UniProtKB/Swiss-Prot annotation:
May be involved in the transport of sterols. Belongs to the OSBP family. Expressed in roots, stems and flowers. InterPro entries: OSBP_sf (IPR037239), Oxysterol-bd (IPR000648). It comes from the Eukaryota. GO terms for molecular function: lipid binding. The gene is ORP4A. This is Oxysterol-binding protein-related protein 4A.
Length: 386
């Protein structure tokens, strides 16, 4: 019992960043930006910031693996992932995949960054029928793998991604490399999706925006979608406005025949217009899906892996949440030193590290991650119903 209580105290489960949390974030954005500008004044434009070290005051109390997982298991309304398979006709399924993809766009805390996961770190959470497992499968470059399955609707989602942040003077441009693959196994359909880039601006007004083009394609149904995430203009940023508009279309891949127009704002509502009938429908409501988000709770403490993000970074998170910056700094150094020591031991013994849950293959500049198990088991950390 004493050991179990000790382990329970080690788990630090931070609340996901919800839509309503942005107002609090905006109040502190100016002071955060001042700290960042003082840190990067010697960094040249175009520099890769992947290994740039931030002080604890600018770090979120969660791992990047948690941020990836939250995009799937953390939602406040309808199970949009399950809806992708419940639709009876192909065009409705593609629209549902578009809706789910939009739902993975989450607000970003301006000027703040999560922990860079250590090699072999994992995060495993369940929400209803959805089970999500992430693992850090490489460190240079920092490749993260994700596998999610929906027990009831027989859906399989895999990601293999790594990001490249570049300093551009007045902003940081974060390119997210890798594809998202969704398989609707009941329908024998595969959907391949690009990922947007993240623009974090410092001047003239601080702000973080998803931008770029996202393609969603299903070869089996000959249907495709293109979404354009539009970054705010200079004037909008200067006024402190967050436009966050999204425009796009759904069309037949072979003929190019356009079926729907997509438009709206990913942090508000997104509409679809049927070009044949002229009918309009709301396909996504952010207020219903990404507000009131809750952290996971511990269901089975004995099954929590030592590699779990919330254990690996627990001491750092405790320090950050209590604003004990020295404690957080020392704890972060300890985590990083343990990782370096493990690397030295492997090199000394000639041992090669391999991921526990994924196989990883390099294909040109890209990386492909395949889960070793067909489904993700129920997790010891769960999202409980409201």
């Amino acid at each position: 019992m004493a050991e179990e209580e000790k382990m329970r105290r080690q788990l630090v489960l931070a609340k996901p960043f919800s839509l309503e949390d942005e107002k609090d974030s905006e109040l502190t954005a100016s002071s955060v930006i001042r700290k960042i500008l003082s840190l990067i004044k010697t960094v040249r434009p175009g520099s890769d910031l992947t290994n740039f070290q931030l002080p604890p005051q600018l770090i979120l109390p969660r791992s990047r693996l948690q941020c990836y997982g939250e995009m799937i298991y953390s939602f406040g309304g309808q199970d949009l992932l399950g809806e992708c398979s419940r639709r009876n006709i192909p065009i409705e399924r593609l629209k549902s995949v578009v809706t789910w993809n939009i739902s993975t766009l989450r607000p970003v805390v301006v000027g703040m960054s999560p922990y860079n996961p250590i090699l072999g770190e994992t995060h495993h959470v369940s929400n209803g029928y959805i089970n999500v497992l992430t693992e850090q499968v490489m460190h240079h470059p920092p490749v993260s793998a994700l596998h999610a399955t929906h027990e009831q609707e027989n859906i399989d989602v895999t990601w293999c991604q790594y990001f490249t942040p570049k300093f551009r003077g007045a902003y940081v441009d974060v390119e997210v490399n890798g594809k998202r693959i969704m398989k609707l196994l009941h329908h024998k359909e595969t959907y391949e999706m690009d990922q947007p880039r993240l623009i974090m601006k410092f001047l003239p007004a601080p702000g973080a925006h998803w931008a770029g083009k996202v393609k969603i394609k299903c070869p089996e149904t000959d249907l495709e979608a293109e979404l354009h995430l539009i970054s705010d203009s200079f004037i909008e940023r200067f006024r402190g406005n967050n436009n966050r508009s999204i425009k796009g279309k759904i069309f037949e891949s072979s003929s190019g025949n356009q079926l729907y127009n997509i438009f709206g704002h990913w942090d508000r509502t997104v509409m679809a217009k049927n070009l044949k009938t002229g009918g309009l429908e709301v396909i996504y409501n952010a207020n219903e899906n990404i507000t009131g988000l809750k952290p996971p709770t511990v269901k089975n403490l004995q099954e929590v892996m030592e590699s779990e993000s919330t254990i690996v970074w627990s001491e750092v998170s405790e320090g950050i949440l209590k604003k004990d910056w020295e404690r957080a700094r020392e704890a972060k150094i300890l985590v990083e030193e343990k990782q370096r020591e493990a690397l030295k031991q492997r090199e000394a013994s000639g041992e090669s590290w391999v991921p526990k849950h994924f196989s990883v293959v390099k294909d040109g500049k890209d990386w492909h991650c395949s889960p070793l198990q067909p489904t993700v088991p129920r997790a010891p950390l769960v999202i409980t119903e409201k």
